[in-house]
Amino acid sequence: MRLACAAVLAAPLALYAAEGLQYNVRINAPGDLDELLEGNLDLVKYRGNPRTDLEQLRRMVRTAPAQANTLLATEGYYSPTVNVQLDESGARPQVTVDVTPGEPVLVGSVEIVLNGFASNQESPFDKEALKASWPLAEGQVFRQGDWESAKRAMLRAVVQTRYPRAQLTESVATVDPDTKRALLRVALDSGPEMRFGEIKIEGLKRYPEEIIRNLNKINPGDLYSEAALQAFQSKLQDTGYFSYVEVTADLNTLIGERQEAQAEQSAGVPAPATLPPVPLLVHVVENKRKNVSLGVGFSTNTGGRTSVSYDDLAIWNLRLKSALTVEQKKQKANGDFYFPTTANGYNDSFGGALERNDIEGEITRTASVYGKRAWGTPLLERSISAEYLNESTSISGAESKHAMSLPFTYAVTWRKLDNLIFPTSGYVLNATAGGAVLPILTDEKFIRVTARGIMYRPLNPKNLLIFRGEIGALRSSSKDGVPTTYLFRAGGDNSVRGYAYQELGVQEGDATVGGRYLATASAEYQYWFRPTWGAAVFYDAGNAADSLSDIHPKSGYGLGARYKSPVGPINVDVAYGHAVRKARLHFSLGFTF
């Protein structure tokens, strides 16, 4: 009986020990200091810990003032008053932390000493600009985090251009609690200047070196630049030839030469102010040459989709990309050949395609061959292309037609975005001009121009306005003989929502066909209630017609959901088409240009 009673009494004590001592902590501190203390004091971190008992709590109460003083000093408060009280009278112990931070310590003076930076008459390093960029100015609150960040930023500004061996040789912050001032001194030694040497390539087996060399804009003798290395590496990653790319300065060569230099210094030879040219090392792992992939999907524009693609990275020293795509409203087979980027930065390609479309009562069958030259950067892309297109058209309620054409087109795209994948500020503009102006393989001569743009205007981090527009015009003696590919229609996910894909255009028989002119516009408001989730309201309007006077805009409006997925922004919209008086679901991934 006595043993049973002991077991009953011991059970709650064992449970209590397993859970740890439960107590309350209340922190009274101004501003954000309460969050600082709550996130770092042992009193808070070890609350409920199975190993925490009353004696350990008392010890943490005794050490809490010193710990709080250390934490407050990181925010510039070096003379705080911290009072910690433990009340054990209740069922659960209560700890109260009262903090009076006092006046913060301010930056009193800043002394920056820059050593090295060997004189270069051609392009001397701007030491005054480096000093002026120091962010921790006199009179600011001296915070430990800001102090460390300022030193890292200054060192980073030096090592990423010209002087990758730079280092801080002195870093002192002298704090006077009486005057509430911090005296700062930083000394930085640049080390020797570095320039790039010849390129060294490792890892190539199947593909020609020209793929890498033609993308390299770093010349022997150029000053070291981390940004140049990253840009070169990014270009190589985008080629599709490599599964892994690393572009660096060959420091192994540098170390060997430095060891030789140190041996000379020990013999009384002075150290050089600059390093010998450092080889540019490119290490790659090649992608497999051939790749076959299958895909299925669905589009609210063209319905269910099945596709098979075949890529070959080295056929006649060219890259082949081919695909067969079968959708409910569109079927297409194409093969494109890509030349390696030239030394002048040109990307040349040619190919051919067979395509069948069944859109709004109009069935078109096209065969085309084409060639293209593109150049530029993601900020400014340009291209010129030529295409021979042979097309037959069957229209419900009208006779069939045949057309062929050989147009040339110049296109340019301007981008100024804060983020290329998830833009929240900036714009993209695209314009094209071209046509078939010679009577060669062309049934009807024409001139065609288009312009489209999208603008992102943030109101604040959670609220965003998006404006989109597109216009197009085609000039010809007659529309007959002009392939429908070059005419204009509107409606669909990335056009006027609330209408079917290319539903808006010119009525011909029982079908909707393309017109000579196009005008669409859209305004959208987005609210991001979470970092990756948002909602939208929008209003779209537009139409296509054979004359400007016949463009009577059709409107659509509705609500949508937005999601920032790993592959890009996903948009799901429900739009009401005012002219057709019914709602339609739209789904799109990202934006189209």
Residue spans for each PLM region:
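C-terminal outer-membrane beta-barrel translocator/porin domains of Gram-negative envelope proteins
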Residues: 238, 394, 398-401, 405-529, ...
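Outer-membrane beta-barrel domain signature
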Residues: 58-59, 141-145, 161, 173-175, ...
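Sec/Tat signal peptide C-region and signal peptidase I cleavage site
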Residues: 13-17
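Bacterial N-terminal signal peptides that target proteins for export
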Residues: 1-5
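Periplasmic polypeptide-binding modules associated with outer-membrane biogenesis and secretion
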Residues: 18-32, 36, 45-300, 304, ...
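Gram-negative/organellar outer-membrane beta-barrel architecture
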Residues: 123-124, 227-430, 447, 494-498, ...
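C-terminal structured "cap/appendage" subdomains that terminate the fold
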Residues: 542, 546-568, 579
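Short beta-strands and strand-coil junctions in structured, solvent-facing domains, enriched
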Residues: 105, 120, 160, 165, ...
